[in-house]
Design a protein with these regions (language model features):
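Small-residue-enriched hydrophobic alpha-helices in membranes
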Residues: 5-258, 267-379, 396-413
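Transmembrane helix boundary and interhelical junction motifs in multipass membrane proteins
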Residues: 384-395
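DG-centered beta-turn motif at the end of beta-strands
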Residues: 262-263
Length: 414
């Protein structure tokens, strides 16, 4: 069989057309030109969710990307996360609105992020300088996924930042149907996700590794929802409220991920998962499927995901966050010392917190005053991004040790 030069040219043109570089300018428009030819991908939310879970996006570990995209080179996990986030958001848009116009989607998603984040920090005005919506969105998605290579190492990025990215998708779905109170909804979804993770870990046979992560989640809740003082199980009542099926499936998968991170499932963990699934209104077959899916995912990818190879996930999770916060404090030590010198009450309360528990009112003061400081120091903006609240307890724990001169005059006697 003979092939003409024109035949090879057609093959090359087709392959080249489906290529995409998610780190080069224009990648979102390229994604749009490809995805508009793939409308059969988005038939219902159930299949869309399953596809996203199979890539690892739901778990915060992006191992694959949609099959209609051919990367020009081996992609980093951040690059896969960018593609999967856009894929997840666009699929949600087409299913919720019955509109597949990509330009309209870009305008809507840009509007969504602006409404959701503009009250948190002034960083948007600095990063959204593109002349087109797609160019602006490229910068915004880069910020959502990477938060800057100077701030985050890849392991930290995949474990904490990307594991919360699916909340963006759930919020976007809510925003499309009812845009009011979207910030309150964001706070609630984060609160429920962290509560579920905490209680899933608490259902395990206690070991030091799991306790470190559980304590981290526990203390972070104070800053996510200041009127909740502890994990007393009241979050379960909110799960009984009328939540979307996609939210409920995500909550269950987060719990399964937490209990399976040590590659085993004990009776009490299984009991927690099935009890949670029942509260979420999910059928037993789906609960079993969720457990089996995370097991298969871990087995399939344990050799390629660094923190699944050797270390307990809780250890890696906590240690990488601590290293990263440590580095941020030291890099910004002079600016922080200046701010602390002007915030005597904050210094006093942080010193006090090293010896005894603060009251809810005191914790709220610490939160608000720290947020004001973070807003004034651009390189600390990560602490006020969605999901960044989980870092605050580590910051509060480390800063007296790393900047002792700022706390000497306010040392609390035991």
């Amino acid at each position: 069989m003979r092939f003409s030069f024109a035949h090879f040219n057609v093959i090359w043109h087709f392959q080249n057309y489906s290529n995409m570089n998610p780190s080069a300018s224009g990648w979102i428009n390229k994604f749009g030109s490809l995805v508009e030819k793939e409308q059969a991908l988005y038939t219902d939310f159930t299949s869309h969710y399953r596809d996203l879970r199979s890539t690892g996006f739901v778990y915060g570990m992006n191992m694959e990307i949609p099959g209609f995209i051919s990367p020009e080179y081996k992609l980093s996990e951040d690059e896969k996360a960018k593609i999967n986030l856009l894929h997840a958001l666009y699929g949600t848009y087409t299913l919720e609105t019955n509109d597949n116009e990509f330009e309209t989607f870009l305008e809507k998603i840009f509007e969504f992020y602006k409404v959701l984040e503009i009250a948190h920090f002034s960083l948007l005005s600095k990063i959204l300088t593109g002349s087109k919506t797609s160019a602006q969105l490229e910068k915004l998605i880069e910020t959502r996924v990477s938060l800057g290579d100077t701030l985050l190492n890849k392991t930290f990025n995949s474990v904490i930042t990307n594991s919360l990215l699916f909340i963006d998708v759930l919020l976007f779905k809510c925003y499309l149907s009812d845009p009011k109170d979207i910030k309150a909804q964001a706070q609630l979804l984060e609160y429920l996700t962290i509560n579920i993770t905490y209680h899933a870990l608490s259902s395990k046979e206690k070991n030091k590794n799991d306790e470190r992560l559980a304590l981290l989640f526990g203390s972070s809740l104070t800053f996510i929802k200041s009127d909740a003082q502890d994990f007393d199980g009241s979050y379960r009542q909110q799960l009984l409220e009328d939540r979307s099926e996609m939210e409920n499936r995500y909550f269950l998968d987060v719990a399964c991920l937490a209990v399976w991170e040590d590659k085993s499932l004990e009776y009490q963990e299984s009991e927690f998962i099935f009890g949670l699934g029942k509260d979420l209104g999910l059928k037993e077959d789906y609960i079993k499927d969720s457990l089996e899916n995370v097991q298969v995912f871990f087995m399939k990818n344990s050799s390629t995901i660094p923190f699944l190879k050797d270390n307990n996930l809780a250890v890696q999770f906590y240690e990488n966050m601590s290293k990263m916060v440590n580095k941020l404090i030291l890099r910004n030590s002079k600016r922080l010392q200046k701010e602390l010198a002007e915030s005597k009450e904050l210094v006093y309360l942080i010193s006090k917190s090293t010896l005894r528990d603060l009251t809810p009112e005191e914790k709220k003061k610490v939160q608000n005053q720290l947020i004001d400081i973070f807003k004034s120091i651009p390189s600390l903006a990560i602490f006020i991004l969605p999901g960044g609240a989980v870092l605050l307890p580590i910051f509060i724990k480390l800063i007296p040790k790393l900047l002792p001169s700022s706390f000497d005059e306010n040392r609390i006697e035991k």
